[in-house]
Amino acid sequence: MPGLPLLLLLLWGVGSHGFPAASETQEQDVEMVQKYLENYYNLKDDWRKIPKQRGNGLAVEKLKQMQEFFGLKVTGKPDAETLKMMKQPRCGVPDVAQFVLTPGNPRWEQTHLTYRIENYTPDLSRADVDNAIEKAFQLWSNVTPLTFTKVSKGQADIMISFVRGDHRDNSPFDGPEGQLAHAFQPGLGIGGDVHFDEDDRWTKDFRNYNLYRVAAHELGHSLGLSHSTDIGALMYPNYMFSGDVQLAQDDIDGIQAIYGPSQNPSQPVGPQTPKVCDSKLTFDAITTIRGEIMFFKDRFYMRANPYYSEVELNFISVFWPHLPNGLQAAYEVAHRDEILFFKGNKYWTVQGQNELPGYPKDIHSSFGFPRSVNHIDAAVSEEDTGKTYFFVANKYWRYDEYKRSMDAGYPKMIEYDFPGIGNKVDAVFKKDGFFYFFHGTRQYKFDPKTKRILTLQKANSWFNCRKN
């Protein structure tokens, strides 16, 4: 590839004392970085013709722009996290330079739009494709004055097709993985049209690529939306499947800024993505897992690793597709390398990213809770004793992980053995011999030997935030 050694020097920061032989993998990564920046960040494919110093700076600035968009550490170099992000399947619409057909911010002038499915993927039945597309349109019509009608022939406002490779729109697909689909802004001709890459496998569940999920995203472009930096938004460029497809509040705000709210008497409200450095952040559940700490909120996890300053935020379904959103408790049993998750009167068990078969199971038959207990507020297990503490309202139970039975004499009042933490526990975990209890925005570091609170901090103090 022309200019590849120069780009290797530029991006990997090799000094002027010599140029090491680039591995085949490294050359492939450089080629991928170059194509990614050309496709999604408007790095012109003739950038190497620019004078050296200016061209070098342009490539680095585009890489920094990409890192900033995805909330990565801005280095201007293709580090491991940047390469990982670039390799994720995504929408083919650029992040900073849209498929512009008309100047300004295009929108449909009429509120009654038509769509036509020109052909069907063999991966799904026609009925499944029709249903996925109809549901995707419904998401947007629920929050706007827009209505959508399917037509079977002729030209529609939004034409939908499954194509592969070069399909004569100046935006060829790249085969399996990579670009999944793309769509064009509102306008005449190709404006509003949606193309799905037939080289990808389309499904109606969590496997491969969920057609409903991708269609809902692409139709956002068809209506005039660009990509969002909010990882919880449907308009986030990378493919995410969280089990339930819904518009985040960020999506709703964006589309209503173009078309206004729906005419429904009650306006739909979407979920918001937690901000790790929000001083008002609270948690649904927390657990240790193989030396890391995972915090759960709604449909998201936040992952704190002692060796990294960055906090990873993503959908729970990325790790465990079958777990529900809104988990209420979680704990680690280190000697079995298991994590148990609780919601309502059900629980699930995983080992690493592997979801064990036979779940969910019932907490009453498995642990011996009385029928009056319909959910667990928080749970934590002690590795040295094999004892697990379950917190429910203002009481707690103690369970023996080796005997697989509840200890006698329980429940007890929380305030008796854990004085000062209050009568309600939202989440808890144990680290280095201390319990960390969470209630609302507060976190209590508790010494079980002295039964004293050692420190009181904000709940998100584990996230290296500058201000709390």
From Swiss-Prot:
Post-translational modification remark: Tyrosine phosphorylated in platelets by PKDCC/VLK.
Record-listed Ca(2+) 1 binding positions: 123, 198
Binding, Ca(2+) 4: 284, 328, 377, 426
SUPFAM superfamilies on file: Hemopexin-like domain, Metalloproteases ('zincins'), catalytic domain, PGBD-like
Catalytic activity line of the entry: Cleavage of the triple helix of collagen at about three-quarters of the length of the molecule from the N-terminus, at 775-Gly-|-Ile-776 in the alpha1(I) chain. Cleaves synthetic substrates and alpha-macroglobulins at bonds where P1' is a hydrophobic residue
Entry's cofactor comment: Binds 4 Ca(2+) ions per subunit. Binds 2 Zn(2+) ions per subunit.
Propeptide: 19-98
InterPro entries recorded: Hemopexin-like_dom (IPR000585), Hemopexin-like_dom_sf (IPR036375), Hemopexin-like_repeat (IPR018487), Hemopexin_CS (IPR018486), M10A_MMP (IPR033739), MetalloPept_cat_dom_sf (IPR024079), Pept_M10_metallopeptidase (IPR001818), Pept_M10A (IPR021190)
Chain positions of Hemopexin repeats: 274-323, 324-370, 373-421, 422-465
Signal peptide per UniProt: 1-18
Entry cofactors: Ca(2+); Zn(2+)
Glycosylated residues in this chain: 119
Record localization: Secreted, Extracellular space, Extracellular matrix
The organism's place on the tree of life at top rank: Eukaryota
UniProt activity-regulation remark: Can be activated without removal of the activation peptide.
This protein's GO CC annotations: extracellular matrix; extracellular region
Protein's GO biological process: cellular response to UV-A; collagen catabolic process; extracellular matrix organization; proteolysis
Main EC class the enzyme belongs to: hydrolase
E.C. designation(s): 3.4.24.7
Comment text on domains: The conserved cysteine present in the cysteine-switch motif binds the catalytic zinc ion, thus inhibiting the enzyme. The dissociation of the cysteine from the zinc ion upon the activation-peptide release activates the enzyme.
PANTHER family for the chain: INTERSTITIAL COLLAGENASE, MATRIX METALLOPROTEINASE
Annotated protein name in UniProt: Interstitial collagenase
The encoding gene: MMP1
